[in-house]
Amino acid sequence: MKAVRAALRLRPLTNSISTSVYLHRFYSAQPQHTDDEHHPKPEELLHQSDAVFDSSHFDLDLNNLAASGAETTTWDERYRDRVKSRVFDEDDTSSYSKILKRDEEKKYKSAALAKSLLEAALDDEEVEVGEVKEEDQKSLSVGIIGAPNAGKSALTNYIVGTKVSAVSRKTNTTTHEVLGVLTKRDTQICFFDTPGLMLKKSGIPYNDIKVRNESGWSSITLYDVLIVIFDVHRHLTRPDSRVVRLIERVGSVSSTSQKRVLCMNKVDLVTKKNDLVKVAKEFKDLPGYERHFMVSGLKGYGLKDLAQYLTEQAVKRPWDEDPFAMSEEVMKNISLEVVREKLLDYVHQEIPYGIEHRLMGWKELRDGSLRIEQHFITPKMSQRKILVGKKGSKIGTIGIEANEELRSIFKRNVHLILMVKVK
């Protein structure tokens, strides 16, 4: 009888879970099941696996928080690192240095933003957009083109003020033309952020990224102003003759109506300012370019002068976009770009450009929130495993951060669903 009693006491312990069920549900993409639930069929596994991220699993009860008297919520990045370490068994030995670096970047960006806001407030010409008669409207189309990872997306995003194209440390993160719109007083400037272009040493475009190259080269003559941008820091540290050849080729394309501008980007990374003078002299007499600007697309240096120049080039022409509304098409595109940016940040050396990224569902719910469903389609199962991560940690992290950013951009609740499939 003693043996039977001992067995009965031990039996409940065999089904215990080492990780807290609450934490596992709150931070992992894997839905939880009880013993009473049925075993899923094979076709159901797609929706009940680590390969699915559903932001509703991560929502807090805002009503209860308000009732408890919580006035503000402060998020400490260290909490996320601790959770990753405890729940996903990730190494956090370098977390402290990462936090310091992240905090430093945030402080710098906050200071730069505050400075820009102050300058805008002191600028008498800077006024809210009101009703402008069609006959008084001015517009300008601007194409931004350059070598891969030259900073085209960061420049567009900073000037426009809304994330319109994926910004990441990886090369070729822009896969198609994206429209950004800046409306100031009676002038509207439409920016087209083109895919990264690169030439072989022979001067011929690469064929391995055919779609990106064809889209970029075919769009060169379509705009009123063409901005050719290159990474001046890389040009000084790791010179690439292909970049110079690209700049020369664009400048040699004949056009009577289009104005071309050469932007030396990422000047904030150059410590010796005399080096910038040398680069400026190198490209000073290059034919085909009307103006030269030294800028930082990430931190905003020189962009006020660039924006002023573009405003002066605007012509009498009705606006193409409504300055007061963000169209659904733009919102869909932003949702894809934000998720893609997070994907490129967390999937480092592993084939991000072979992954198909599709918007599968978009619905505005009665309460004003958005339900967004996106799918990642990988060529191989091994690539799917990389993207999903251990216990869904990678796709979960991508989903959490993308959902936070989309809520901030759209100023409403967002229900984001990410699913990883194999082609």
Swiss-Prot record:
Residues 265-268 are annotated as: G4. The keyword Endoplasmic reticulum does not apply. GO terms for molecular function: GTP binding; ribosomal small subunit binding; rRNA binding. Keywords: GTP-binding, Nucleotide-binding, RNA-binding. GTP binds at residues 146-153, 193-197, 265-268. Residues 146-153 are annotated as: G1. Residues 193-196 are annotated as: G3. Pfam families: KH_2 (PF07650), MMR_HSR1 (PF01926). Residues 172-176 are annotated as: G2. This is GTP-binding protein ERG. The lineage of its organism: Eukaryota, Viridiplantae, Streptophyta, Embryophyta, Tracheophyta.
